[in-house]
Amino acid sequence: MLYSRTLFFSTIALAGVAFGAGPAPAAPASPEWAAHAVWYQIFPERFRNGDPSNDPTHDSLEEPAYVPKDWRISNWTADWYARDAWEKEQDGHEAPDVTPDFYKHGVFDRRYGGDLQGVLDKLDYLQSLGVNAIYFNPIFYARSLHKYDGSSLQHIDPYMGPDPKGDLALIAGENEDPATWHWSAADRLFLKLIAEAHRRGLHVLVDGVFNHTGRDFFAFRDLKENQQASRYKDWYVVTSWLNPADPSSKFTYKGWWGHDTLPVFAATADKNDLAPGPRQYVWDVTKRWLAPVVDGQPAQGIDGWRLDAADERPAKFWTAWNAYVRTLNPNAYTCGETWKPAAQFVEADGFSACMNYFAFAFPVKGFLIDGRIPASRFASLLDSRREAFQPGVIPALQNLVDSHDTDRLASMIVNRKLATYAPDGDISYDEKNDVRNNTTYDIGKPDATARAIQRMVVLFQMTYEGAPVVYYGDEAGMWGAHDPDDRMPMVWQDLKFAPQSTDPRGKARRADDPNFDPAVFAFYKSAIALRNSHPVLATGAVRFLNANDKEGTLSMLRFGADEDMVVAINRSTKPRVIRISDPLLNWTKPEVLMSSGAKLPALSKSGSGWELRLPALTVVVCRGAVSASPVAAAQPLGSTAAH
């Protein structure tokens, strides 16, 4: 090992200790497996309908009184923007639909019947893709399609299991006391899913919504019915009570971001913790799913939690909760959701990591997707925001680009010229990225250029430090604007989808084929295989080289004790020559492992370094020591090559 390399590693370690004012707190140990994770995010209602017998019913909807009686399960393979008859009847609850609006209410009352059996049926698909960790959006009992409005956190949604009617009867009399809780058919099927996932080497993360509930949550139902006499009166933030002596009185309460469908759990008087009632309930739910005991026997539990709206709960609560989690499972992974600078939040609250919007997704959008910030700024943003975290946290950060809360990656790219940037250079993300807020938003299928940029993003994501996240369907070629269009039914090889030929704005549009794209899948699979085959991509250090703002090029060195890899990027729309040279680079017999383009470019010696001739909009991965056969170049995204 070169002395200069040792010095560089030492500098990184010292920087991690010295960052910020005063000594940095010791970071919670992220489990080793999290550094090697390739995450796959599943939005359960839209992933796969494996058991049509458990499909949701009209009465199971969020507000069935406002939904026409001829409501029915939506056709999985239909044109997403084509409205069913019952949707056209629904406008502003009870008024007839005189001006059809796709985004009024109907689309949010659609149900497609995605369930746990559908996930079980597709575990082999996930394994073949190469991912090794699943992140589930909420799967607990709730009325909405997104299920962030929990009716119960101790039970899987009955309509995701094999016996909805039986489960609903079984759990009807339960309260916050775990002694009253049963293991429903849906619960047991989820435990089976966990065991089957583990058998395939897949870890399981579930969405924990500990900030708010739905109005059907047992405690809130009792509160609404019994008012100040309710045993749960201290569980929520009530702002006014009903007064039998005053007909004008109203029952009001704090809802998450003002939404009355999402009543917020109360905090302690000093605002430093969750109120005792909901706090204990969260503790009990946490234990139930991390360390389940079924019929007197221990069962395999989940491997961790993704925490919704985590930065809206007090640090004291999360610190204690994270410590409790690790008493149940020292290898559990806890990931807080935040869109803000997150290093202090992660460390102070004791999380393993966070959803890495600020330190990864934002810079990636600014440079690779939108092409609006220079290469040097891209590198400096990634460096400064990454290095704000403790070194032990960085490899476990969830490096996502899109999610259920954004437009899809492919559509971000299609609409890259619509992106807005603040005067201070801040990168827009999750703003006006849909038809409702931006009538010029393009809902069409990505063209060849957009797919080329998608390949760049994916290959960089798979080679950068931190655990990459694939949002369901991206690997199959799916596109879509912000919610609800980012939650279309998953396209599968065995299903034939109708063309997307309807425009929600009533405009004429071309007919786009949304069916499973084998070339897109092949590229994702190759990029994931590259990451899984080279541990340096998961745990090696990062150093950016040769940023050229004029040419739109940049290189990144990933290095460890046994292997060096260089990722060369050409974001420009013209071919470029990139020279790779650095004192830390200790290459012998270098080779090109993978390209986001159609062919592997030649690597040639140039003085003390190496030269690559990169086509436009291309990322290439090289390494120095030949110890295994290179990953084969995948077909370009969007090609017609068979999978």
Predicted regions mapped to residue ranges:
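N-terminal structural segment of carbohydrate-active enzymes
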Residues: 25-202, 280, 287, 617, ...
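Aromatic- and acidic-residue-enriched segments that line the glycan-binding/catalytic groove
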Residues: 31, 35, 51-73, 142-162, ...
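Loop/helix patches that line or flank the sugar-binding groove of alpha-linked glycan CAZymes
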Residues: 34, 49-104, 379-587
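C-terminal beta-strand-rich structural cap/linker in extracellular carbohydrate-active enzymes
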Residues: 38-39, 603-641
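Conserved, mostly hydrophobic/aromatic
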Residues: 42, 126, 136, 153, ...
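Short, solvent-exposed turn/loop segments enriched in Gly/Ser/Thr/Pro and often Arg
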Residues: 44-46, 134-146, 208-217, 308-313, ...
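Active-site-proximal helices and loops of the catalytic beta/alpha 8
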Residues: 194-202, 211-212, 220-227, 285, ...
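Active-site-adjacent "subsite" loops/lids of carbohydrate-active enzymes
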Residues: 224-288, 292-293, 310
